[in-house]
């Protein structure tokens, strides 16, 4: 595996490749990330991964400076997955001058849910993903369903900007107790780690209620938030939305069996966790 930090060197290395599969990451890789590499290999060759902790998507009170950086361990894991190139640019490589041009998602998709609680986050994501795709020029790119809203925004962005990249969705990888794998799980204390699976259990109960015929979605969302709050969580949102556009479904759409997803974000201690389940 070649480890490259220069954009020009990356382009030189990939010149002539027309089936490249790309997996962008921020590093601190776990089994969830590695599953993305394996899925990428099913859809293209060679597989290119990137590791870049993107300052643009962190808010002023978020964890950019303490976000775990484990490059040497990550390199070993990617080598074991037979990744062809790891693109690991420095901040100077990616942003040699202030990044004044940004890619802004529409408010109806980028300003809700995560966008409401993390203003500027999706503009940072869209900007860096567009720039990375310009560097790699892949045929396909793999994103995880764990970041459901991000997946939808990136897919829509590629459609709207006519980027010739197919976005592949990867299923969420979970620990045995159901907790979705995340680089931020390492922030949890032992007691918090024991409690953390309650988030997905809460979403499972919401899903079961909807599938069982409950149509008062607002009541379900409120009860789920209250349940987590009683257990010491600080929920930002629990929302049942249409999979197609993350808009709340109408009564007619519910009766017609509209595909739904329930999404959640909540703090447990100092750690903010997100998760979702399709319904």
UniProtKB/Swiss-Prot annotation:
Pathway the protein acts in: Cofactor biosynthesis; (R)-pantothenate biosynthesis; (R)-pantothenate from (R)-pantoate and beta-alanine: step 1/1
GO MF assignments: ATP binding; pantoate-beta-alanine ligase activity
Keywords tagged on the record: ATP-binding, Cytoplasm, Ligase, Nucleotide-binding, Pantothenate biosynthesis
Principal location class: cytoplasm
EC category name: ligase
InterPro entries reported in the protein's UniProt record: Cyt_trans-like, Pantoate_ligase, Pantoate_ligase_C, Rossmann-like_a/b/a_fold
Keyword tRNA-binding: no
One Pfam family per UniProt: Pantoate_ligase
Binding site for ATP: 26-33, 144-147, 173, 181-184
Catalytic residues identified in the record: 33
Catalytic reaction annotation: (R)-pantoate + beta-alanine + ATP = (R)-pantothenate + AMP + diphosphate + H(+)
EC identifiers of the protein: 6.3.2.1
Function: Catalyzes the condensation of pantoate with beta-alanine in an ATP-dependent reaction via a pantoyl-adenylate intermediate.
Assembly and binders: Homodimer.
Record's miscellaneous remark: The reaction proceeds by a bi uni uni bi ping pong mechanism.
PANTHER family documented for this protein: CYTIDYLATE KINASE/PANTOATE-BETA-ALANINE LIGASE, PANTOATE--BETA-ALANINE LIGASE
Protein known as: Pantothenate synthetase
Species: Burkholderia vietnamiensis (strain G4 / LMG 22486) (Burkholderia cepacia (strain R1808))
Gene transcribed to yield this protein: panC
């Amino acid at each position: 595996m070649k480890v490259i930090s220069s954009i020009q060197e990356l382009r030189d290395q990939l010149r002539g490749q027309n089936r490249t599969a790309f997996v962008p990451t921020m590093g601190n890789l776990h089994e969830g990330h590695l599953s993305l590499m394996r899925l990428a290999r099913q859809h293209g060759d060679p597989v290119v991964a990137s590791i870049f902790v993107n300052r643009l998507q962190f808010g002023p009170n978020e964890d950019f400076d303490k976000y775990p950086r484990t490059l040497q361990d990550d390199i070993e894991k990617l080598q074991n997955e037979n990744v062809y190139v790891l693109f690991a640019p420095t901040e100077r490589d990616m942003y040699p001058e202030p990044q004044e041009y940004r890619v802004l998602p529409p408010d109806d998709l980028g300003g809700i849910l995560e966008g409401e609680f993390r203003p500027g986050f999706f503009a940072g994501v869209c900007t860096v993903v567009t720039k990375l795709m310009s560097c790699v020029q892949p045929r396909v790119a793999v994103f995880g369903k764990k970041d459901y809203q991000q997946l939808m925004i990136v897919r829509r962005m590629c459609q709207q900007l006519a980027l010739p990249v197919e976005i592949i969705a990867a299923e969420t990888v979970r620990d045995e107790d159901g907790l979705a794998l995340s680089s931020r799980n390492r922030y949890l204390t032992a007691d918090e780690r024991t409690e953390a699976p309650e988030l997905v259990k809460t979403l499972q109960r919401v899903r079961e209620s909807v599938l069982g015929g409950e149509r008062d979605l607002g009541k379900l969302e409120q009860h789920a938030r209250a349940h987590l709050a009683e257990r010491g969580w600080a929920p930002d949102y629990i929302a049942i939305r249409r999979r197609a556009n993350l808009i709340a479904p109408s009564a007619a759409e519910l009766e017609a069996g509209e595909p739904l997803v329930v999404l959640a974000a909540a703090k447990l201690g100092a750690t903010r966790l997100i998760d979702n389940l399709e319904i």
